[in-house]
């Protein structure tokens, strides 16, 4: 009987021990789960030889340095600017070189394109250890861009892909952006946790290190949002993207792609064509508003000037009648 009870306890404790150990490993490795720091020396060296691309160093308010690349629109002294937040297994050198070699960089003609590396990626030191580090990374880049003479501060747009969608959404919620594009977005980190190991419910969800609550910031985004999601995405569940879209007040378009895996969104010309149309639409919309208010100002000046002129004529007439 005693032997039977011991066996029973073993059968009960063993699965529980495996679960506890698994949770412990997951909790301790959450940074690796969400972020995969990497570098591409070959692409970096290749871009250093290309005068069309400039290496950027941004000094943060904490005294750290963020590295990345800028494709500047040299046709204008001040241009609309797109800040692109990368996926978790990408780095700025690889992405910019890929855009260049594939010709997709041409979709950003007439725009500046700024892509910076997360802490631990490329030449950027450190690591993303919590939400604050990740979100502040986004605002540091925006604030730097806004101060540059070659950037039209009234036309800064942000894009986010995969893990980068939370940073992009956050920046759009706390800064004055002209547009927001999200590719393979998620609603919150909790969804991603449970998609891998569906145990983070109730008190256990307090064990999660990252929140990355894009859905929390979405209601504070004022601009129409363009979203791409695929039902075949094996990394970001389509339902997570769809759920996030419900938290925005204004969706420009939610585009559902078929049979597109997570790493192949930017291989689709449909995606690029729609992004380009959206960028120009947002810029033109701003220009129309600017033109409208300029016209109102001109009309106001003309009306005031005419009133002053009429008033002067009447004053002159009264003077002549008196004398």
Language-model features, listed with the residues they occupy:
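Acidic catalytic loop of the alpha/beta-hydrolase fold
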Residues: 232-236, 263
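Short beta-strand/loop motif that positions the catalytic acidic residue
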Residues: 221-222, 226-229, 233
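Membrane-embedded segments
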Residues: 61, 65-144
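Hydrolase active-site cap/lid region
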Residues: 165-220, 264-267
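Short alpha-helix in the alpha/beta-hydrolase fold that links the catalytic acid
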Residues: 97-98, 214, 223, 237-246
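Alpha/beta-hydrolase fold nucleophile elbow
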Residues: 151-161
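C-terminal catalytic histidine-bearing segment of alpha/beta-hydrolase fold enzymes
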Residues: 242, 246-289, 300-302
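An N-terminal hydrophobic leader/cap segment in hydrolases
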Residues: 15-59
């Amino acid at each position: 009987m005693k032997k039977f009870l011991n066996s029973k306890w073993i059968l009960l404790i063993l699965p529980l021990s495996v679960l506890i150990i698994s949770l412990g490993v997951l909790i301790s490795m959450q940074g690796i789960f969400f972020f995969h720091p990497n570098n591409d020396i070959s692409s970096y060296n290749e871009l250093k030889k290309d005068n069309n691309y400039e290496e950027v160093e941004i000094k943060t308010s904490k005294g750290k340095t963020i590295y990345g690349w800028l494709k500047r629109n040299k046709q204008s002294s001040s241009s609309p600017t797109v800040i692109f937040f990368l996926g978790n297994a990408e780095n700025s050198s690889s992405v910019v070189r890929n855009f260049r070699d594939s010709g997709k960089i041409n979709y950003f003609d007439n725009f500046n394109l700024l892509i910076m590396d997360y802490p631990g990626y490329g030449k950027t030191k450190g690591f993303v250890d919590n939400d604050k580090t990740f979100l502040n990374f986004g605002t540091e880049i925006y604030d730097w861009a806004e101060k540059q003479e070659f950037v039209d501060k009234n036309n800064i747009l942000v894009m986010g892909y995969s893990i980068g969608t939370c940073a992009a959404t956050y920046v759009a919620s706390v800064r004055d952006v002209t547009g927001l594009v999200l590719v393979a977005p998620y609603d919150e980190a909790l969804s991603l946790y449970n998609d891998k190991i569906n145990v983070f419910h109730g008190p256990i969800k307090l064990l999660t290190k990252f929140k990355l609550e894009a859905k929390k910031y979405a209601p504070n985004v004022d601009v129409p949002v363009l979203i791409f999601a695929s039902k075949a995405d094996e990394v970001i569940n389509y339902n997570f993207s769809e759920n996030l879209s419900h938290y925005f007040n204004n969706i420009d378009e939610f585009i559902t792609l078929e049979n597109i895996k997570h790493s192949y969104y930017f291989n689709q010309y449909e995606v690029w064509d729609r992004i380009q149309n959206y960028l120009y639409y947002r810029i033109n919309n701003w220009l129309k508003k600017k033109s409208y208010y300029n016209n109102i100002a001109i009309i106001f000046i003309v009306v005031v000037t005419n009133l002053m002129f009429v008033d002067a004529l009447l004053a002159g007439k009264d003077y002549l009648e008196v004398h």
